[in-house]
Amino acid sequence: RDRAGVGRRHGAAVAEGLANEGMRVVCSDIDGQTAEATAARIGGDAIAVATDVADPAAVEALANQSFDHFGQVDVLFNNAGVFQGGLAWERSLEDWHWTFGVNVFGIIHGIKYFVPRMIAQETDGHVVNTASVAAFVAGATSGPYVVSKCAAFSLSESLALDLGAVGSKIGASVLTPSTFDTGIAKTARVRPSHLGEDKTPDGLVVAEYLQKQLDSGMPASEAFTPFINGIRTGEFLIPTKPSYADQIRNRYEALLKRQIPGQLVPD
């Protein structure tokens, strides 16, 4: 059993929940010490592997270590993510590349190096990719993040359809967190040093606003229940709250009217 991006918050909660279900867990995070701390809390057979999911060689090494250590992988959770806010035209190309490198190519790398081997096992399994409610309901001053999460959602759709087309026993779902404490607003800690610190007013304002919303949201410890229930029931879309259904519906109604959808309104 394997997961990617489990060092903090809801990733760690899901890792611990899977372990409680009797699964052997590989904890992966760009911060090796954080991954090791999660593995230590889990105990038993859990192992930690420091991995930058934006680096294909690192994800390939993660896959090799996971399969070599446990023999097979049944659940893959592509969860690593970063937040980059700000006005679309104010963001540097490097900001866009960094955001997509983790939020989109991190998932692509996981699919590339894990899924073929999971299919070859000819056993039941599941891939869960983390997108966001922002994939449906966007907001201003969050362009890189929102666009990357839309891509993550579409990538998950393509994966699910491809797996179905070949008759695979592997299922695919997309987790769409809303306002709960994912830690996504504090990803400046893993921002590459060559990008420098983001001190632009547009970026700082939206990051501060996002953190306030997350602080008042549901605790990360509640992430596991929708995650495991979604896998068990074969749901493609795994929301962490049902309360965004109306906003999702409003989005598509606006599009049918050829209008710009409204912004996300936290509840």
Question: PLM features: residue spans?
Answer:
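Active-site helix of classical SDR
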Residues: 111, 148
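Canonical Rossmann dinucleotide-binding motif of NAD(H)/NADP(H)-dependent dehydrogenases/reductases
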Residues: 1-26
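Conserved glycine-rich Rossmann-like NAD(P)H-binding loop of the short-chain dehydrogenase/reductase
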Residues: 21-37
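Substrate-binding pocket helix/loop in short-chain dehydrogenase/reductase
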Residues: 87-88, 95-97
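The beta1-alpha1 cofactor-binding region of Rossmann-like NAD(H)/NADP(H)-dependent oxidoreductases
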Residues: 32-33, 51-61, 93
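Residue(s) in the substrate-gating loop at a strand-loop-helix junction
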Residues: 132
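SDR active-site lid
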Residues: 165-237
